[in-house]
Amino acid sequence: MTKDQFLTELNSYLSVLKPEDRKNTIEFYKEYFEDAENEEAAIEELGSPKKLAEEIIDFHKTSYRGENTQVSRQFSPDESISEIILNITAAKVLINASQEEKIEYNTQNIADDDFSAKIENGKLVIKEKPVFFFSKKGFVSFLENFNINTSSNTSKREILINIPKDTHLEKLEFNSQMGSLKIEEVNIEVIEGYTTCGNFVVKSGIHKKIDFNTSAGAINISDMDIETMKLSSSAGAIKFENIKAGNISASTGAGTIDFIKTESSYINANSGAGNITGNELKSDRGKFNTGAGTNKFQKCDFNEAILNTGAGSIIFQGNLHSYAKINSAIGSVDLNLPDKVENYDINIFSKQGSVKLNGENVEGRGDRLNLGSKTSDTNIKISTTFGKIKISTQEGE
């Protein structure tokens, strides 16, 4: 069987799908063959066109079947619930505080057979049945790349959970393939989980720990005091706003990391490709790394700080108290400090690039310079391989 024969057969078996779904599916498998190194091996991996078509049709039929379906339920106050476990395939989950005395849930566009909720030993376990079958690598790849939002109704599958406002849950666990999670004004001691493709949002509420990962999706945390957070996204932005924390760890393979009006004893932020920004950010110890991107901080206050970028600029305006290490392999450094230069011990290494202090060129021997006073309690080390260095202090204002 050739590639063209395979696609023709597959197309005929998919005749029951909506035209747009059918077209998008065939286009995907055309690209699949184009990317394959060996046509025969790709066909063997996919299996028979008929079997593959059955799996794809089942995926779409489940979505069609749940359209416009609504289910709701209230749990009795006598049913004690301390934890919630959510095993989700593709639904958007919203968890809100309510004025009611009972925990309740509502679903939208999820068929009855695809949803279950029960209490087990104080745990509310909610499951959304998988809407697809992972039997072959090719079909898994299809699901990872297929435009679900425009081609089926999984984007409209929704679960709304209302929690009485005075309730304090010990833990919430969220495990999802293509679903998102938003929690607002609900008190949950520990929140943890992952989503392969979807966003994660937590706003307000009383929390101790958040540990969450998304392979492809944005993370947004706001308006809370918390002990520790560990957040990661392979491809997506991470944003903190109005936060007071003990420890923050944030990493993204490709995306920005933003801190707005945030205070934390310790911060470790890493972006493989994307900017890291801070506005009114305060930390006792902060480490900020970008592989390719700008580090930009305004109105910030650090006791100890390490700012690194492989390819990109570093811009800092604010207070540095004890120690700062600023490194840019390819990119400029712009440092704006509030005190006089003699209140800092500044050590500069610049392989290629000019150094300016308050608008004036600084000349020195070789590639190393010292500015300020060696007796200062604030030590700042600046290093660039290719990039200009600009320093502004109180005298230059």
Give residue ranges: language-model regions.
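Short linear S-[DN]-x-LW-Φ motif typified by the pepsin-like aspartic protease active-site region
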Residues: K23, Y64-K129, S135, N149-Y194, ...
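Short, charged early-sequence alpha-helical segments and their helix-coil boundaries
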Residues: E37-N68
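Residue-level detector of well-ordered alpha-helical segments, enriched
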Residues: D21-T25, L52
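Amphipathic, heptad-repeat alpha-helical segments
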Residues: T2-P19
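A composition-biased, non-transmembrane "mature-region" signal
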Residues: S12, G47-K50, F134, S155
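Short, surface-exposed interaction patches in beta-rich subdomains
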Residues: K129, S151-N153, R157-E158, N162-T167, ...
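Amphipathic alpha-helical segments that form the core helices of the histone-fold
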Residues: T25-E40
